[in-house]
């Protein structure tokens, strides 16, 4: 299982330009072509944003991959089936009100539209502006966390007010779907991936949780690797070791 932004691809202020690190598509394509590994991306983005970025054009990866979007609230299967958790009308109205307020507040930063969340990004802003945006966003979001089903999700250079979901639920579902004893790995970089690491660690089996980022930080992940060399090396090793066995890999973003 793999996260996308910050794990498979470097962060970009313009998220539409966040393409995988050099060589990553090619090694994922070889893993996919072996027919022995299920590749799953688990991202905070809407699921349909991931496949075009990951596969490239023309596609390097022959087939679609399974994508869990919105931190696990959305699932896009390889055959095109799509499931998304519904938000109650009352909660949706509140999120719409907050989103509309932010659009007219001139805070700076960037508002990301998600059906189940309001997201404020300040990546690329100066430290002074970033602190200002974060403070104002917290002042707006934190009182609303008390509402039923809403939670505040912190990540690098952003805050997300969302319906209560995290990547751990997606990881639990994926692991629960594969035969006992199947090797599973989750690779992620951000604070939003900690729930996924914790879920992997709770399951008994030959599983790995890996923090993939330039510098180490406190984490529940079992291992730390530095991208992009650590990422490419891990994926190549996975292909070499498990190329002839039926295995499952899941990915986050």
Model region roles, listed by residue range:
Residues 2-7, 70-73, 115-116, 121-123, ...:
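Short loop/turn segments at strand-loop or loop-helix junctions that form parts
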Residues 7, 47, 192:
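Conserved Rossmann-like nucleotide-cofactor binding loop
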Residues 11-12, 50-53, 196-197, 221:
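Short glycine-/acidic-enriched loop or helix-start segments at secondary-structure transitions
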Residues 73-76, 118-119, 158-162, 217-218, ...:
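A short acidic, often aromatic-flanked loop/helix-cap motif at beta-alpha or helix-coil junctions
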Residues 168-253:
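Mg2+-dependent phosphoryl-transfer enzymes with acidic/Ser/Thr/Gly-rich catalytic loops
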């Amino acid at each position: 299982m793999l996260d996308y932004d910050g794990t498979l691809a470097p962060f970009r202020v313009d998220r539409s330009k966040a393409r995988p690190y050099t060589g990553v598509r090619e090694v994922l394509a070889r893993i996919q072509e072996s027919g022995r590994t299920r590749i799953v991306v688990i991202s905070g983005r809407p699921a349909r944003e991931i496949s075009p970025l990951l596969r490239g054009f023309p596609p390097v990866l022959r087939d679609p991959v399974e994508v869990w979007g919105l931190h696990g609230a959305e699932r896009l299967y390889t055959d095109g089936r799509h499931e998304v958790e519904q938000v109650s009308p009352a909660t949706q109205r509140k999120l719409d009100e907050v989103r509309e307020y932010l659009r007219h507040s001139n805070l700076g930063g960037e508002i990301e539209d998600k059906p189940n969340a309001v997201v404020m990004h300040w990546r690329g802003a100066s430290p002074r502006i970033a602190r200002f945006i974060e403070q104002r966003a917290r002042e707006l979001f934190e009182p609303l966390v008390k509402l039923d089903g809403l939670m505040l999700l912190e990540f690098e250079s952003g805050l997300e007010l969302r319906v209560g979901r995290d990547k751990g639920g997606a990881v639990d579902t994926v692991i629960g779907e594969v035969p006992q004893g199947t090797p599973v790995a989750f690779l992620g970089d951000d604070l939003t991936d900690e729930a996924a690491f914790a879920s992997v660690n709770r399951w008994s089996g030959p599983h790995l949780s890996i923090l993939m980022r330039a510098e180490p930080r406190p984490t529940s992940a079992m291992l730390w690797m530095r991208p992009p060399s650590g990422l490419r090396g891990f994926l190549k090793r996975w292909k070499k070791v498990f190329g002839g066995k039926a295995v499952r890999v899941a990915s986050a973003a």
